[in-house]
């Protein structure tokens, strides 16, 4: 059978579910998530510690966080990548909260920030000691509630459809390899075609 979607997401971890939610909420089209087991089996749930983000600008700032990250990475980290991740972190935290993630808070309503190894300030947001499971819970609920996202559980992507399936020669040196979808093994042991833009 052939299915057509605007977006095809292979994998149901934090990256896959976040991307699906972002494009669906932006009304960019219909999304399908291919999940090899069940939605709640992603490895996101095993992350325990927390998420580092500058949230208290009275005591912390991006430059401190960037410096801490570069030191912890023995200055091997790509400075541009570190800067991007650190400066975008508060926006990502807001998005996770909007999707329903419940980070621990103090009595005054402020985030209950922890300080972990490599950090000079209290900037770790957490949910008890199962932050990954809490993020996954929130993302699953948001995905399941979104009418523009279909989830295919216990489906396995067996091959990505590229231009070589259309007769074009593709080698390691082909400058642009385009993805048109995937061949997916369904729960009846049949291979379906999932096409996307």
Feature annotation, model-predicted:
Residues 7-33:
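N-terminal Rossmann-like FAD-binding beta1-loop-alpha1 element of flavoenzymes
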């Amino acid at each position: 059978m052939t299915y057509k979607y605007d977006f095809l997401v292979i994998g149901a971890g934090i990256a896959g579910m976040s991307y699906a939610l972002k494009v669906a909420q932006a009304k960019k089209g219909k999304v399908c998530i291919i999940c090899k087991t069940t939605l709640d089996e992603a490895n996101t749930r095993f992350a325990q510690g927390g998420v580092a983000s500058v949230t208290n600008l009275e005591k912390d700032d991006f430059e401190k966080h960037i410096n801490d990250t570069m030191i912890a990475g023995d200055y091997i980290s790509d400075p541009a990548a570190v800067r991007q991740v650190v400066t975008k972190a508060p926006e990502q935290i807001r998005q996770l909260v909007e999707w329903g993630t419940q980070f621990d808070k103090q009595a005054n309503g402020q985030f209950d920030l922890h300080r972990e190894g490599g950090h000079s300030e209290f900037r770790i947001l957490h949910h008890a000691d199962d932050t990954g499971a809490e993020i996954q819970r929130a993302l699953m609920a948001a995905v399941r509630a979104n009418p523009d996202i279909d989830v295919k559980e216990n489906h396995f992507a067996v091959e990505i459809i590229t231009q070589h399936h259309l007769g074009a020669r593709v080698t390691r040196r082909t400058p642009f390899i385009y993805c048109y979808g995937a061949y997916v093994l369904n729960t009846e042991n049949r291979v379906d075609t999932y096409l996307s833009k």
